[in-house]
Amino acid sequence: IYVPDDYQTSKKRYPVLIINDGQNAFFDEQSYIGKSWGFLQAVKQLNIDVILVAIYCNFELLKREDEYGPWIMNQDLSREYGTHRLVGGEGNAYVTFLTTQLKPYLDQNFPTKIDDYGIVGSSMGALISFYAFLKYPTIFKKCAILSTAFWIYEEEFVNLLKVSSISHNMLYMDVGGQEDDKRYIPSNEHLKECIEGKLQNYQYHFFPNGKH
């Protein structure tokens, strides 16, 4: 958990950003991709007052896919991961933990703005971030999703989006032209079209040379 230097004396309350795949958030030596996202440098350079909560994923074999998968993958998709079991399905329990255990703990122990939470993630971490954003729009009012693996649960997200009340919330979304699976671009474009009719405070960026 990162807190502003003066949080104990300033008497301010701060917005909170939940960071999935949290081992990538701060330090290169902790990142499983070898390079951190540089959140510490960013908040200091931009002079942003925010509490950052970086949550490590379970990086055992297929556990990240289970933990960040809101629904159970179908058999064909599960087999792409080289297993005969069905993958995913623990994401709802994870998001329930965020909303019913982690958020109350943060609000009780840190000077949070209790109605100003955001959530961010990439790839599978983006899937679970977007799921939380749609499932609990009164809690997670801001969301950033990068290189989202929408093709895994494309139909499920389209259906959830139809019944989610996110019209007053904020969303950032991007995808690269050099992702490691050709399904990233069309599935992100499809969800982009569905999202555009749901909220106005929304940015979508396509980076032609962007890699996963």
Predicted regions and their residues:
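Non-catalytic cap/lid and distal C-terminal segments of serine-dependent acyl enzymes
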Residues: Y2-H212
